């Protein structure tokens, strides 16, 4: 990807919004590239609160002024109180400690969700990690979503595919998929398809 960007004089935007919730993985593209052709974007709303719309980016020096201008033109102001509160959290190690607690709770939620899913005959397409997982339910998840619409909302795999092809996979949020009633409803809906 980096070679293509270089060859076509393009920049890559690496959106890493869930960085604080993701397990350690391969190096970021921006790190491999030393910010020559990449713009790294992340934020704090997923780990702290959605109301704190404060993010950050790292970019090639040649792009920084244009990115600042774009930010100023598109948002006019920045919530100073939120920025100050976030700076306090960063300076005093509060974000790190908070992140550790959130990750512990997420691990417990993930474990409960995996047990529930597997006890209802589902399997994970990839090892469960981070905030989201891919569950194979064995039936077309778009049809399943329609069957469950009155009780629960699910995220069919087709929504996450460029060609919107049918899929037996659904994306689950481990933090919100721990209710046994959800998995029982999924069983009933599958049986009715």
Predicted segments, located by residue:
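PLP-dependent class I/II
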Residues: 1-193
